[in-house]
Amino acid sequence: METETATTPTGNTEPTAAASAEPPKSDKVTVRLRNIADAPVLKNKKMVVNPTDTVASFILKLRKLLNIQANNSLFLYIDNTFAPSPDTTFETLSRCYSVKITDKEILELQYSITPAYG
């Protein structure tokens, strides 16, 4: 790591670390899925997604896994209460709604093919 010097407001010079060229390593987001009502059951209920993935892209992946056609609905819910916006990233959802289970942060989502709440 290279060091540079910076001048403080009092006129002294202090060594500072140069900015790293690599972006900070982003962790994956672990998602646990649970079906509601008459939605098909997934074989693997845990998925790992990139934090930059959006809810809309995740719904497309989930549609393929569940063999749900484009003309049928698929609803996602958080905490059995509300649907996240399609343009929300999993980084935001994870920061706000993840729960800690055995030293791992897990985002719990519920899915349904019919409106379940409201």
From Swiss-Prot:
GO terms for biological process: autophagosome assembly; autophagosome maturation; autophagy; autophagy of mitochondrion; cellular response to toxic substance; determination of adult lifespan; glycophagy; macroautophagy. Coiled coil: none annotated. GO terms for cellular component: Atg12-Atg5-Atg16 complex; autophagosome membrane; cytoplasm; cytosol; phagophore assembly site membrane; transferase complex. One of its GO terms (molecular function) is protein tag activity. Keywords: Autophagy, Isopeptide bond, Membrane, Ubl conjugation pathway. Ubiquitin-like protein involved in autophagy vesicles formation. Conjugation with atg-5 through a ubiquitin-like conjugating system involving also atg-7 as an E1-like activating enzyme and atg-10 as an E2-like conjugating enzyme, is essential for its function. Most likely a component of an atg-5-lgg-3-atg-16 complex that promotes autophagosome formation by associating with lgg-2, but not lgg-1, at the preautophagosomal membrane. Probably, as part of an atg-5-lgg-3-atg-16 complex, required for lgg-1 lipidation; the complex acts as an E3-like enzyme promoting atg-3-mediated lgg-1 lipidation. This is Ubiquitin-like protein atg-12.
